UniProtKB/Swiss-Prot annotation:
Organism: Xylella fastidiosa (strain Temecula1 / ATCC 700964)
EC numbers: 5.3.1.23
Record family assignment: Belongs to the eIF-2B alpha/beta/delta subunits family. MtnA subfamily.
Protein name (database record): Methylthioribose-1-phosphate isomerase
Metabolic or biological pathway, per its Swiss-Prot or TrEMBL entry: Amino-acid biosynthesis; L-methionine biosynthesis via salvage pathway; L-methionine from S-methyl-5-thio-alpha-D-ribose 1-phosphate: step 1/6
Free-text function comment from the UniProt entry: Catalyzes the interconversion of methylthioribose-1-phosphate (MTR-1-P) into methylthioribulose-1-phosphate (MTRu-1-P).
Active site residues according to the UniProt entry: D245
Length: 354
């Protein structure tokens, strides 16, 4: 398949949240954005596990990439004559990394890839692991640029778009998935208006996405999550563009909580709905969305904003982090392998196998 070349990503891609120094990992602390730009150093796999669990790093692709470097750091703590022995000794650390955020399939995919690489490695297994982690990050950036071009091509000139959560450079190796499509659409003059939902309770849209777009000089308008239906009714939005943490064999898609209601609202108003994610996010072993484990986080996250409590004491809260959008509500799934319009199990199988 021909891969169209997107515009120069250096114009609209200024943020890098993951920095490997050759000795340790530096992660942009996304809990403190937009007011504090601070990097956290990870010197061990346990540091990386904690960074994933506590949302220093977030976004399915970024979590996977960071887990790869976590495996590299774990390798610094053991001795082994070859990859097979190393794999046996590293398995507990790999399992801890996997347990840090269970919903995102990229995390499991990267760790499985590191296991395969190790099992074939010889005495140079440490170097092989580091090369593999570098390849994973490089491939993600290449895939994002490709997806940006594919997705932007679907958007008519002069369109308005709405996005949810953060799917840009902060959530990936760079450029972004859904936000990469928006960057490309802006560069091509296809997108005239960008709206961003605030994305409670962690406010990834309000804290991260509008800040990231601001770094690139892209104007964006923030809305309350509850304003999305009214916005769509006004006719200012032609596409909703979101990322994914897991895409099932039938096109059902797990993504940040609130995505499902956007898809329902978009269908009612005749607004198109696009999911953008790398092929690594596709899980052909999971038949449908009902089988996806939905992460539940501490209800305390819902009881305040930025550490300031806004709810009376003694109030219960329900805090699922993801929901599942049925494939039937999705107009297009965009990966680096191309576009699947009106996705179903047959089309998914034709593109991704199984």
């Amino acid at each position: 398949m021909h891969h169209p070349l997107p515009p120069d990503d250096t114009l609209y891609d200024q943020v890098r949240p993951i920095l490997w120094t050759g000795h340790f990992l530096k992660l942009l602390d996304q809990r403190k954005l937009p007011f504090v730009v601070e990097y956290v150093e990870c010197h061990s796999s346990e540091d990386v596990t904690q960074a994933i669990r506590t949302l220093i790093v977030r976004g399915a692709p970024a979590i996977g990439i960071v887990a790869g470097w976590g495996a590299v750091l774990a390798a610094r703590e053991i001795e082994a004559v070859d990859g097979i022995e190393a794999l046996c000794k590293l398995e507990p650390a790999l399992q801890r990394l996997h347990a840090a955020r269970p919903t995102a399939v990229n995390l499991a995919w990267v760790l499985a890839r590191m296991r395969r690489t190790l099992s074939a490695a010889h005495a140079d297994w440490r170097q092989v692991m580091e090369c593999e982690a570098e390849s994973i990050a490089r491939e993600d950036l290449t895939a994002n640029r490709c997806m940006g071009a594919y997705g932007a091509a679907l958007i008519p000139i002069g369109s308005g778009v709405l996005t949810h959560c953060n799917t840009g450079s902060l959530a990936t190796a760079g450029f972004g998935t859904a936000l990469g499509v928006i960057r490309d659409g802006i560069a091509q003059g296809r997108i005239a208006r960008v709206f961003v939902g605030e994305t409670r309770p962690w406010l990834q849209g309000a804290r991260l996405t509008v800040w990231e777009l601001q770094q690139d000089g892209i104007d964006a308008t923030l809305i309350a999550d509850s304003a999305a239906a009214h916005l769509m009714k006004s006719g200012q939005v032609q596409w909703v563009i979101v990322g994914a943490d897991r895409i099932c064999a039938n096109g059902d898609t797990a993504n940040k909580i609130g995505t499902y209601q956007l898809a329902i609202t978009a269908r009612h108003h005749g607004v198109k709905f696009m999911v953008v994610a790398s092929a690594a996010t596709v899980d052909m072993d999971t038949v449908a969305g009902e089988a996806i484990e939905i992460e539940q986080r501490d209800p305390e996250e819902l009881l305040g904003v930025s550490g300031v409590r806004t709810v009376a004491e003694g109030i219960a809260a329900w805090n699922p982090v993801f929901d599942v959008t049925p494939g039937a509500l999705i107009d297009a799934i965009v990966t680096e392998r191309g576009v699947i319009q009106s996705p179903d199990a047959a089309q998914m199988r034709a593109t991704f196998g199984n």
